[in-house]
């Protein structure tokens, strides 16, 4: 197993972890329906980039 030669400081550890933060998902608004959705995902009613891809049933 690898063993470090010298202890890393808190500063070095935190600098390494600086890229590990959580990012907020980007939100877009559909041009056709005006509904908010995640980028590159379709809306809940089946629209993506102005076209309806799926017919969503109202049973659920």
Swiss-Prot record:
GO BP term (any one): translation
InterPro entries (alphabetical): Ribosomal_bL32, Ribosomal_bL32_bact, Ribosomal_zn-bd
Domain of life: Bacteria
Ranges of compositional bias, category Basic residues: 1-20
Cellular component aspect of the GO annotation: large ribosomal subunit
GO molecular function term, any single one: structural constituent of ribosome
Keywords: Ribonucleoprotein, Ribosomal protein
Stretches the record annotates as Disordered: 1-22
Alphabetized SUPFAM superfamilies for the sequence: Zn-binding ribosomal proteins
The keyword Magnesium is assigned to this record: no
Keyword Ribonucleoprotein: yes
HAMAP family: Ribosomal_bL32 (MF_00340)
Similarity annotation: Belongs to the bacterial ribosomal protein bL32 family.
UniProt-recorded name of the protein: Large ribosomal subunit protein bL32
Protein source organism: Psychrobacter cryohalolentis (strain ATCC BAA-1226 / DSM 17306 / VKM B-2378 / K5)
């Amino acid at each position: 197993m690898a063993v470090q030669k010298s202890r890393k400081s808190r500063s070095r550890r935190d600098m390494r972890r600086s890229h590990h933060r959580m990012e907020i998902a980007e939100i877009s608004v559909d041009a056709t329906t005006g509904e908010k959705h995640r980028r590159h995902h379709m809306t809940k009613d089946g629209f993506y980039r102005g076209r309806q891809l799926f017919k969503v049933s109202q049973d659920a």
